[in-house]
Amino acid sequence: MVKMTRSKTFQAYLPSCHRTYSCIHCRAHLANHDELISKSFQGSQGRAYLFNSVVNVGCGPAEERVLLTGLHAVADIYCENCKTTLGWKYEHAFESSQKYKEGKYIIELAHMIKDNGWD
């Protein structure tokens, strides 16, 4: 008999002295403001931000999608804590002008809030 155990996910916490973005649903930290690349993106549910790196985020399988800027291979990303879909990760850009997005993350504003040090 094989005993199945569920692996525990350890949550990353960003330094409290930095401005951060958190999941609006469970308040898990998602990104440091210093990792923000652009506020000029569109997600499937409205405005979105492009980040260089994120934490506490899982990644689904990549698939090809035609987005506003052309064909990309993207993978949906979700909060590791509450499993809410947050946006996507750019795995591959087919047009040379879009290559800068590869390996970067889109998080929709509808799923995140500002945390720590925004006063």
Swiss-Prot record:
Widely expressed. Detected in fetal and adult kidney, heart, liver, lung and skeletal muscle. Residues 19-116 form the Yippee domain. Disulfide bonds: none annotated. It is found in: Nucleus, Nucleolus. Keywords: Metal-binding, Nucleus, Zinc. InterPro entries: Yippee (IPR034751), Yippee/Mis18/Cereblon (IPR004910), Yippee_fam (IPR039058). Zn(2+) binds at C23, C26, C79, C82. GO terms for cellular component: nucleolus. One of its GO terms (molecular function) is metal ion binding. It comes from the Eukaryota. Coiled coil: none annotated. May interact with FAM168B. PANTHER family: PROTEIN YIPPEE-LIKE CG15309-RELATED (PTHR13848). Belongs to the yippee family. This is Protein yippee-like 2. The lineage of its organism: Eukaryota, Metazoa, Chordata, Craniata, Vertebrata.
